[in-house]
Amino acid sequence: QREKRISEINTGIYFVDAAFLFSGIKRIKRENAQGEYYLPDLIEMAVKQKERVAALTHINAAEVMGINNRIELSEANEVMRKRINNELMLSGVTMLNPENIYIHHGVKIGKDTVIYPNAFLEGSAEIGERCVIEEGCKIINSAIGDGSVIKSHSVIESSQVGQNVSIGPFARLRPECII
């Protein structure tokens, strides 16, 4: 009952004096159902030794959320998807229905590019300025030149598309195509 009222979580992030850490680890006992070493036991040791101990709060709980099952993994993915999309929109990319656009971290997209729903941009994809990526497109590890239009449901993989080129709809560029 008492545990249910606790509104804090252990993020697993610790700042610890190295000497204390190494001596403390040797003294941690594995007296639990899993037979595991519990690093939080170091906190109790530190308190008993009158070491300085402090808990910190984080302004954004989503940044330190635990992931212990597929639901929490999905929630963490959603946090990251929103962060990536928001950063791109603030830099001048237009997203029509950003809730349904999936862009991997590290993808580069130029200003004034418009991305339609259900687009997937993955790996080291680079999209130039003033491009249009229509609905249902998947672009993986490819470069799309400025002013190009990738029409609906096209798949481009490990290829290069030049400037002011129109691809699709329903096109498939296999690896190493240069258009």
Where are these predicted regions, by residue range?
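Catalytic-core segments of class I nucleotidyltransferases/pyrophosphorylases
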Residues: 1-81
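Long, charged amphipathic helices and adjacent flexible linkers at domain junctions
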Residues: 77-106
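Short, intrinsically disordered, charge-balanced linker/junction segments flanking boundaries
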Residues: 1, 174-179
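Short, solvent-exposed amphipathic alpha-helical segments in soluble enzyme
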Residues: 30, 81-82, 118, 130
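Left-handed beta-helix
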Residues: 97-99, 104-105, 110-111, 116-117, ...
